[in-house]
Amino acid sequence: MKLDTSGLETTMPVIGFGSNSEMLDGFSSAPSFDLPRTTDFDGFQKKAVEMVKPAKGTTTLAFIFKEGVMVAADSRASMGGYISSQSVKKIIEINPYMLGTMAGGAADCQFWHRNLGIKCRLHELANKRRISVSGASKLLANMLYSYRGMGLSVGTMIAGWDETGPGLYYVDNEGGRLKGDRFSVGSGSPYAYGVLDSGYKFDMSVEEASELARRSIYHATFRDGASGGVASVYHVGPQGWTKLSGDDVGELHYHYYPVAPITAEHVMEEAAE
């Protein structure tokens, strides 16, 4: 038995565009864009992103000691050899007990830290408890891993205090994740490590630890042209994070290397000798 479907077959009129052939002619005359002459178009895109990646510079550091975690950073933002800002906030408050640092592309770091803060808050609402530092760093690493090779520029430290005590992790834009007791990230990190490694002790007081962090940032800004501005120091303890200081590195120079007053008579006496 064959169904009669003749009543269902209708011809839809074309309104305002003429015939189908006219429509196809219009599409064929539209401008076209040639693809790059390469067999690996995805690989070409990744290389193109690397070619236009701007130079960046910063100095951030964090270390664990007996009273919690000390976090410090400078505030200079650069675009190649151009200093675009001296007041960038490179230590971001994820929640009252956790901090993140920025090194790399400012937009990438700010976006992913903001995204991490939202997810940490949702975790707290769903589970009735704060997320651990380990869990937050793993969450960020997983998110960045899913975008690896896409041109992101992120080098961050996640520092905080949870039920197990202080925690410190380094996370990069490829999804890498490292646990440690002290890290320094950025173009000024080799200079900061020189001071940090020589002066680090686990049993420091809060005042000693903050001075070590401040001095490490200062010496990095003194040698690294892409670091500068203000040296901000934060402490994360059992009661949450606290900002301890924010000193201009230009003023810190005269704090560590004071200039003795010289009179004109003294200069004349030295010249006579």
From Swiss-Prot:
GO molecular function, one term: threonine-type endopeptidase activity
Catalytic activity: Cleavage of peptide bonds with very broad specificity
Compartments reported by the entry: Cytoplasm; Nucleus
Cell membrane is among the record's keywords: no
UniProt keyword Iron, yes or no: no
EC number: 3.4.25.1
Keywords, ordered alphabetically: Cytoplasm, Hydrolase, Nucleus, Protease, Proteasome, Threonine protease, Zymogen
GO cellular-component term (any): proteasome core complex, beta-subunit complex
Single GO biological process annotation from the record: proteolysis involved in protein catabolic process
Active site residues of this protein: 58 (nucleophile)
Domain of life of the native organism: Eukaryota
Residues that make up the propeptide removed upon maturation: 1-57
Assembly mode: Component of the 20S core complex of the 26S proteasome. The 26S proteasome is composed of a core protease (CP), known as the 20S proteasome, capped at one or both ends by the 19S regulatory particle (RP/PA700). The 20S proteasome core is composed of 28 subunits that are arranged in four stacked rings, resulting in a barrel-shaped structure. The two end rings are each formed by seven alpha subunits, and the two central rings are each formed by seven beta subunits. The catalytic chamber with the active sites is on the inside of the barrel.
Family: Belongs to the peptidase T1B family.
Cited function: The proteasome is a multicatalytic proteinase complex which is characterized by its ability to cleave peptides with Arg, Phe, Tyr, Leu, and Glu adjacent to the leaving group at neutral or slightly basic pH. The proteasome has an ATP-dependent proteolytic activity.
Name of protein: Proteasome subunit beta type-5-B
Source species of the chain: Arabidopsis thaliana
Gene: PBE2
